[in-house]
């Protein structure tokens, strides 16, 4: 009888310990995600050598075309039954816009490290926003990301896209006639189907706080600005189907 009670007690203890350990692991992972999200980010911009300066002076300044939704930010609005963001996650900012005479609130979440990313690449490229979203929404998002830095002054919206088979195509020749100097960063392959050799694909982002895709792109973007034609490099990525 006593042995049976001891076994039952031991099993109860083991079950409790297992649950306690699982809860501890959950808290640890949550803390790690928080630390990663808010850790200090550094990407040292070293002075260019004389050789690098000379090389850069011989090529045109490049243009980096940036998509918004699921590339730099993710948003959802009032009335969404199944939001893609975990309930309780506070937005980075809220936009109130009027669409078809109806006020709509958008809860906008910034992709991890987007502010740092924009700060760095604005020193290397002329930045252009090109979104398939409506101008009244896209303009408000771009204003927030620009944050009075005047780095996102050129902007293109849905009316500048071409609608084909239900999807919006972004014609980069609208931005500049010289396609050798244009790079587009977009999560939607359909958006750049007319210019695949100018594209850097990036994974769609919704809510992962540990995402580092924008940081991972910095070395590549740093190197691309030295090329005579960005397509000579980016066209090779097509065969690998690599997403950043």
From Swiss-Prot:
InterPro entries: Dullard_phosphatase, FCP1_dom, HAD-like_sf, HAD_sf, TIM50. It is found in: Endoplasmic reticulum membrane; Nucleus membrane. Residues 57-224 form the FCP1 homology domain. GO terms for cellular component: cytoplasm; endoplasmic reticulum membrane; lipid droplet; Nem1-Spo7 phosphatase complex; nuclear envelope; nuclear membrane. It is a single-pass membrane protein. Its EC number is 3.1.3.16. It is an enzyme of class 3 (hydrolase). GO terms for biological process: canonical Wnt signaling pathway; gamete generation; mesoderm development; nuclear envelope organization; positive regulation of canonical Wnt signaling pathway; positive regulation of triglyceride biosynthetic process; protein localization to nucleus. One of its GO terms (molecular function) is protein serine/threonine phosphatase activity. It comes from the Eukaryota. Its main location: endoplasmic reticulum. The keyword NAD does not apply. Keywords: Endoplasmic reticulum, Hydrolase, Membrane, Nucleus, Protein phosphatase, Transmembrane, Transmembrane helix. It holds the Pfam family NIF. The chain crosses the membrane at residues 7-29. Interacts with CNEP1R1; the complex dephosphorylates LPIN1 and LPIN2. Belongs to the dullard family. This is CTD nuclear envelope phosphatase 1. It comes from Bos taurus. The lineage of its organism: Eukaryota, Metazoa, Chordata, Craniata, Vertebrata.
